C-alpha cells in the first residue's frame, strides 16, 4: 500500500527534573518510540522530541536541600534522564530542557500575544502562605481533601482520584507539604489566563476526532461544570522565568512546560541550521501533524489549557493527544517497600531493554487502560515469544545453511503461497501499529510465528539433512524458514531495535517494510550467532532486591553540614547589596565578665573603632591569640544593646557551634576598611 510521506512531530510528556526515570515513565516513552519507528519505516519525516521539565518550587527546594544550585541539579538530572532513555533505545531527535533560552523567548512571546489579545487578566487573590517557611505555597506543596470527591491527601491543583482541578484555597483541611504547618491566607496580585473565552473552540476541537473517546467524554464533564480562569503566575521565591514587566512574579511551571515542546523543536531546528521548519510545523495553518503522548494524569492541562494557549497566541493546535494509563507491577501500585518501584537504570542492570519494550508493547492498545507488569508472566512471555518462536526460527535453520551451503540461500521459495500469507499480513499489522493497537499487532505477528514454526516442524529439516540426494530440499526448507524469520523481524523492528540490529547482521541486509515483498533468493547470510538469551526468575528476584536496597539507601538520613543547617530562602541581589561587609583588624579580644559564651572584640575598620560582642568564646579559650588577626564583619548592622554594653556589628564565622567555630579571615593583603564584594 503506497503512502504519501507526511511531516510528523511527536512528543512525550516532559519528565520532571527532580527525580529518576522509573518503569512508569518508560511505558509512555516506549509506546511513542514504537509508533515513531513504525512511521519512519513507512517513509514519513518524523521529528521525535522531548525535554526535562525543569522549573518550579520542588526543584528549588530540593536543590537547597542538596546544597547546590537549581541549575546544577537540573543539569545532572538531564544527563541521567538522557542516559536512561538511550539505554532503552528511545530514538529522540532532540532532548532539551524547559530552562533554556528558546523556551524563555517562546514563553514570553506566547504570553505577550495572549496579553495583547486580551486573554490575560490581573487580580488580587488570597493565597495560602506557610508562616513557618515564610513563602507562598505552590499548588503541589499543599495537600488536603479534594473539594469535589472528598478524597484525602490530594494536591492543591488537581485531584488524582477524580481528575478535578481547583484552587488550593478550596482544599478541605489544607496542610503545608514543606513544614506541615496549617497555611494562612495572604493577598497577592496574580495573572490569569481567560480559559472560558475558548470554551466554544475547545468543544468543537473535542468533537473533531482529535481525542480518544474516553478523553472526549471526560472533557464534556469539565465543560458542563464550567471552565475557570487559570492562574499562570507564582510569587518569588521561585525557580523559573520571571514574567516580563512584573518583578517578583514568575510563570507557573504548567505555562512554560508544554511550551517546552516548542522550545525543544526550536533548538533542534537551530542545530540543523533549519529556520524554516519551526514555522512550518507550528504556524496556524500548518499541514504537518503534531502528536502528544501523555499519561491520563495530565489530560486536563493538555486538552484544555494547551490548545487554548496555542489558539490565543496564533499557533496551531495538536493533531491528536495519545493518552495512556498507569503501570502497575504484579497487580498493584508500584511499591518501594516491595521492591516494585523500579528505576529504569536498575532494570537495565538486570535485563535488556528489548524485553520490557516487547512486554509493554504486547499489552498496549489505543485505550487509556492501565498496564500490569506481572514479572512472572514477563519472564514466560519473553521466553515463549522472542526466544522460542522468533529467534528459534532462525537458529534451527541457519546451522544447515551455514554448514552445508556456505551461507547461501536457495534461488527459489519452497512455498510461495505461505510467503504471500506472511507479506499480505503487512496491511493488518501496519494498521495496528498506526492506530496504536500494539497488542493486536503482536498477536498477529506471533500467529505468523506459530505458522512458520509449524512449517519447519512439518518439513523436519533435521531429518532431510540425513537423507541422501536431498540437499536441494534441505536448502529450500531452511531458506524458507529464514525468509519467514526476516518477515517477522521486519514487523517487530519498531519494538526490538537491538535484536533487529543482530538479525540484520545475520541476514546481511537491512530490514525495510517494503523490502519483504522481495524474498532473499540466492542471498548469502552471515554465520549465525546467538541473537537472544533466555531470562529467568532469578534475574527478577535480583531486580526486586536491588530496588529494595536502593530505597533503603535513599531513605538513609542525609548527613553533613547542609543537612544539619539547610540553605536559607533565596534572596535578591538587591537584598544582599544592603549588607555592608568590611575587613576589620582585631585590636583587642577579652573575656566578658558574667558570660561563658561571649568575647569582647575591639575592631579597627581603618579609621573607625567598633566594639563587638561575639559568641565565640568556646572556640577561642585564649582570646589574646586573636589580637592582630584580620576578620570580616557586618559593618552596617544596627547597634544592639546588651546587658554587657552596646554591640556595634557582627563578625563572620563558620561552623556548627561549640568548639567548632571558625572565624573568617580575608586573604593576605586585605586592609582594614576594605569592602567585601
Swiss-Prot record:
One GO location term (cellular component): cytosol
PROSITE patterns xref list: AA_TRNA_LIGASE_I (PS00178), TRBD (PS50886)
Cofactor: Zn(2+)
Sequence motif 'KMSKS' region, location on chain: 333-337
Keywords: Aminoacyl-tRNA synthetase, ATP-binding, Cytoplasm, Ligase, Metal-binding, Nucleotide-binding, Protein biosynthesis, RNA-binding, tRNA-binding, Zinc
EC number, as in UniProt: 6.1.1.10
Reactions the enzyme catalyzes: tRNA(Met) + L-methionine + ATP = L-methionyl-tRNA(Met) + AMP + diphosphate
Binding site for Zn(2+): 146, 149, 159, 162
A GO MF term: metal ion binding
Binding locations of ATP: 336
Residue ranges of domain tRNA-binding in the record: 575-677
GO annotation (BP), single: methionyl-tRNA aminoacylation
Chief place of localization: cytoplasm
Subcellular locations according to the entry: Cytoplasm
Record has Ligase as a keyword: yes
Cofactor note: Binds 1 zinc ion per subunit.
'HIGH' region (motif): residue ranges: 15-25
Gene3D superfamilies xrefs: HUPs, Isoleucyl-tRNA Synthetase, Domain 1, Methionyl-tRNA synthetase, Zn-domain, Nucleic acid-binding proteins
Pfam families associated with the record: Anticodon_3 (PF19303), tRNA-synt_1g (PF09334), tRNA_bind (PF01588)
Superkingdom as given in the UniProt entry: Bacteria
Biological role: Is required not only for elongation of protein synthesis but also for the initiation of all mRNA translation through initiator tRNA(fMet) aminoacylation.
Family according to the record: Belongs to the class-I aminoacyl-tRNA synthetase family. MetG type 1 subfamily.
Quaternary structure annotation from Swiss-Prot or TrEMBL: Homodimer.
Name of this protein: Methionine--tRNA ligase
Organism encoding this protein: Shigella boydii serotype 4 (strain Sb227)
Lineage: Bacteria, Pseudomonadati, Pseudomonadota, Gammaproteobacteria, Enterobacterales
Gene name of the record: metG
Amino acid at each position: 500500500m503506497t503512502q504519501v510521506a507526511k511531516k510528523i512531530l511527536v512528543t512525550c510528556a516532559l519528565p520532571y527534573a527532580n527525580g529518576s526515570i522509573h518503569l512508569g515513565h518508560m511505558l509512555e516513552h516506549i509506546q511513542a518510540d514504537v509508533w515513531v519507528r513504525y512511521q519512519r519505516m513507512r517513509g514519513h519525516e518524523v521529528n521525535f522530541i522531548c525535554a526535562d521539565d525543569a522549573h518550579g518550587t520542588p526543584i528549588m527546594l530540593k536543590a537547597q536541600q542538596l546544597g547546590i544550585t537549581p541549575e546544577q541539579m537540573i543539569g545532572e538530572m538531564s544527563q541521567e534522564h538522557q542516559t536512561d532513555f538511550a539505554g532503552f533505545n528511545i530514538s529522540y531527535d532532540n532532548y532539551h530542557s524547559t530552562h533554556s533560552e528558546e523556551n524563555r523567548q517562546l514563553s514570553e512571546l506566547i504570553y505577550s500575544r495572549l496579553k495583547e489579545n486580551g486573554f490575560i487578566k490581573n487580580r488580587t487573590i488570597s493565597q495560602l502562605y506557610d508562616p513557618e517557611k515564610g513563602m507562598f505555597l505552590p499548588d503541589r506543596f499543599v495537600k488536603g481533601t479534594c473539594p469535589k470527591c472528598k478524597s484525602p491527601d490530594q494536591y492543591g491543583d488537581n485531584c488524582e482520584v477524580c481528575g478535578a482541578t481547583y484552587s488550593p484555597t478550596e482544599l478541605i483541611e489544607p496542610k503545608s507539604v514543606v513544614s506541615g504547618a496549617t497555611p494562612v491566607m495572604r493577598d497577592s496580585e496574580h495573572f490569569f489566563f481567560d480559559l472560558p473565552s475558548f470554551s466554544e473552540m475547545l468543544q468543537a476541537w473535542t468533537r473533531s476526532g482529535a481525542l480518544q473517546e474516553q478523553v472526549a467524554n471526560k472533557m464534556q464533564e469539565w465543560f458542563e461544570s464550567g471552565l475557570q480562569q487559570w492562574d499562570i503566575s507564582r510569587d518569588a521565591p521561585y525557580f523559573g522565568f520571571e514574567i516580563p514587566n512584573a518583578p517578583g512574579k514568575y510563570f507557573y511551571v504548567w505555562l512554560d512546560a508544554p511550551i517546552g515542546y516548542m522550545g525543544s523543536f526550536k533548538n533542534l531546528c537551530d542545530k540543523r541550521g533549519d529556520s524554516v521548519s519551526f514555522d512550518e510545523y507550528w504556524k496556524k495553518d500548518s499541514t504537518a501533524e503534531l502528536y502528544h503522548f501523555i499519561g491520563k494524569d495530565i489530560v486536563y492541562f493538555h486538552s484544555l489549557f494547551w490548545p487554548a494557549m496555542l489558539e490565543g497566541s496564533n499557533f496551531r493546535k495538536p493533531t491528536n493527544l495519545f493518552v495512556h494509563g498507569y503501570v502497575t507491577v504484579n497487580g498493584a501500585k508500584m511499591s518501594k517497600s516491595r521492591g516494585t518501584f523500579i528505576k529504569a537504570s536498575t532494570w537495565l542492570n538486570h535485563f535488556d531493554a528489548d524485553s520490557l519494550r516487547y512486554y509493554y508493547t504486547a499489552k498496549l492498545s489505543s485505550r487509556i487502560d492501565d498496564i500490569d507488569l506481572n514479572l512472572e508472566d514477563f519472564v514466560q512471555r519473553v521466553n515463549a515469544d522472542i526466544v522460542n518462536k522468533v529467534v528459534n526460527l532462525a537458529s534451527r535453520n541457519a546451522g544447515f545453511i551455514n554448514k552445508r551451503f556456505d551461507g547461501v540461500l536457495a534461488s527459489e521459495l519452497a512455498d510461495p503461497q505461505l510467503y504471500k500469507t506472511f507479506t499480505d499480513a503487512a496491511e493488518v499489522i501496519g494498521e495496528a501499529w498506526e492506530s496504536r493497537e500494539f497488542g493486536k499487532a503482536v498477536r498477529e505477528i506471533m500467529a505468523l510465528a506459530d505458522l512458520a514454526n509449524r512449517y519447519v516442524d512439518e518439513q523436519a529439516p533435521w531429518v532431510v539433512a540425513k537423507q541422501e540426494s536431498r540437499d536441494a530440499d534441505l536448502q529450500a526448507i531452511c531458506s524458507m524458514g529464514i525468509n519467514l524469520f526476516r518477515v517477522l523481524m521486519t514487523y517487530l523492528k519498531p519494538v526490538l531495535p537491538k535484536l533487529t540490529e543482530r538479525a540484520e547482521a545475520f541476514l546481511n541486509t537491512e530490514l525495510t517494510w517494503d523490502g519483504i515483498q522481495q524474498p532473499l533468493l540466492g542471498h548469502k547470510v552471515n554465520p549465525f550467532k546467538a541473537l537472544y538469551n533466555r531470562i529467568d526468575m532469578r534475574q527478577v528476584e535480583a531486580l526486586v532486591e536491588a530496588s529494595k536496597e536502593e530505597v533503603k539507601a535513599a531513605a538513609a538520613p542525609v548527613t553533613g553540614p547542609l543537612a544539619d543547617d539547610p540553605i536559607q530562602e533565596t534572596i535578591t541581589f538587591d537584598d544582599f547589596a544592603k549588607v555592608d561587609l568590611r575587613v576589620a583588624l582585631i585590636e583587642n579580644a577579652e573575656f566578658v565578665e558574667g558570660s561563658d559564651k561571649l568575647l569582647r572584640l575591639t575592631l579597627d575598620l581603618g579609621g573607625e573603632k567598633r566594639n563587638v560582642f561575639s559568641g565565640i568564646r568556646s572556640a577561642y579559650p585564649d582570646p589574646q591569640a586573636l589580637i592582630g588577626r584580620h576578620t570580616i564583619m557586618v559593618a552596617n548592622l544596627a547597634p544592639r544593646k546588651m546587658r554587657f554594653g552596646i554591640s556595634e556589628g557582627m563578625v563572620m564565622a563558620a561552623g556548627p557551634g561549640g568548639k567548632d567555630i571558625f572565624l573568617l579571615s580575608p586573604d593576605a593583603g586585605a586592609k582594614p576598611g576594605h569592602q567585601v564584594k
